[in-house]
């Protein structure tokens, strides 16, 4: 059961993809476990809010379990700070704590709290399609460039 996504992705090994992103819910259900088993890398988006830190702690425990029992190649390589509101001390404190814990894994780009980012899914659109010139869209493009500059982990057979 835990290998369904890995098996499906094996069909893409001969394709010319630089990255394959698997967007998962924050809960640890079968979809998330399948994604963690299939992937060599994890990108964690973290909201700059208090309770997000508690969720990250649980996620790291779960990643450790998957790494120990199902996918020894699994590694958190990238952390993206989201819903950042520079007007609040809390956002700065959360960002500082995340940077202290994850160090160079945290992207320099942060995604600001934005009405446009929040509205886009309601129209079944990405923020880049919904409002390409918005701060949120531009920040996501900056983050994607930063990820591309870092480069992907080498592909290991069976792990796309």
Which residues does each PLM region occupy?
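P-loop/Walker-type NTP enzyme "switch/lid" segment
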Residues: 1-18, 70, 120-123, 127
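Charged catalytic carboxylate motif
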Residues: 4, 58, 139
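Conserved catalytic-core segment of NTP-binding enzymes
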Residues: 10-115
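C-terminal boundary of histidine-terminating zinc-finger modules
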Residues: 121-142
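A short, amphipathic alpha-helical segment
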Residues: 141-153
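C-terminal helical "lid" subdomain and adjoining coupling/linker elements of P-loop NTPases
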Residues: 152-160
């Amino acid at each position: 059961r835990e290998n369904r996504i890995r098996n499906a992705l094996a069909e893409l090994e001969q394709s010319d993809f630089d990255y394959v992103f698997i967007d998962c819910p924050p809960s640890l259900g079968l979809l998330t476990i399948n994604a963690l088993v299939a992937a060599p890398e994890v990108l964690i988006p973290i909201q700059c809010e208090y309770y997000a830190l508690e969720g990250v702690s649980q996620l790291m425990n779960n990643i450790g379990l998957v790494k120990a029992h199902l996918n020894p190649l699994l590694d958190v390589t990238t952390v993206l700070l989201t819903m950042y509101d520079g007007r609040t001390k809390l956002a700065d404190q959360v960002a500082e704590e995340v940077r202290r814990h994850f160090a160079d894994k945290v992207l320099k780009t942060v995604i600001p709290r934005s009405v446009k980012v929040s509205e886009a899914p309601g129209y079944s659109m990405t923020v880049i399609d919904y409002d390409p010139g918005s701060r949120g869209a531009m920040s996501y493009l900056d983050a994607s460039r930063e990820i591309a500059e870092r480069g992907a982990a080498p592909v290991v057979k069976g792990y796309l």
